[in-house]
Amino acid sequence: MYKKGIYKILTNEPLTDAVWRMTLAGDTQWISAPGQFVNIALEGKYLRRPISICDYDDRSIALIYKVVGGGTEQMSRMLPGETLDLLTGLGNGFSTKNDARRPLLVGGGVGVPPLYNLAKRLLAEGKPVQVVLGFNTASEVFYEDCLLYTSPSPRDPKTSR
């Protein structure tokens, strides 16, 4: 089930030259699992933009997106206080109800954001999580520090690239 709503931009900041993190305030009751996504309507664009949810709580949603075209470039220019029309609670997401004792999460590029909330959920359930991240270049790396704490034996980020 999904919900359409208007969400207020709280933050919109670059993480790298091409990757941005946007935090939105609004109703999150239809988001039920890590790995779900939203569809964003943008002024002057016919199609909505699907963006995976990085994190959420009962009042806000964090999205991470890469600027790859006109729509995401338009998003990168948006300022706190502006609003967006979203469809939320889309996709099945990831289930954490399984017998996995040591889950291995693998993601790269814009496939990394949905793993953040999944890792948080699994850790809250007492499951030690291992994370493998991939990026095209070192300049494109983001959220490595946020996900590094989930690894059972933290490595020096400078030598692990």
Residue spans for each PLM region:
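Ferredoxin-reductase
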Residues: 2-82
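Histidine-anchored nucleotide/phosphate-binding helix
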Residues: 114-123
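Anionic-ligand binding region
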Residues: 142-148
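A short, basic/flexible loop-to-alpha-helix module at the beginning of a structural domain
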Residues: 89-97
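Conserved beta-strand elements of the Class I
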Residues: 104-106
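Short internal beta-strands
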Residues: 129-136
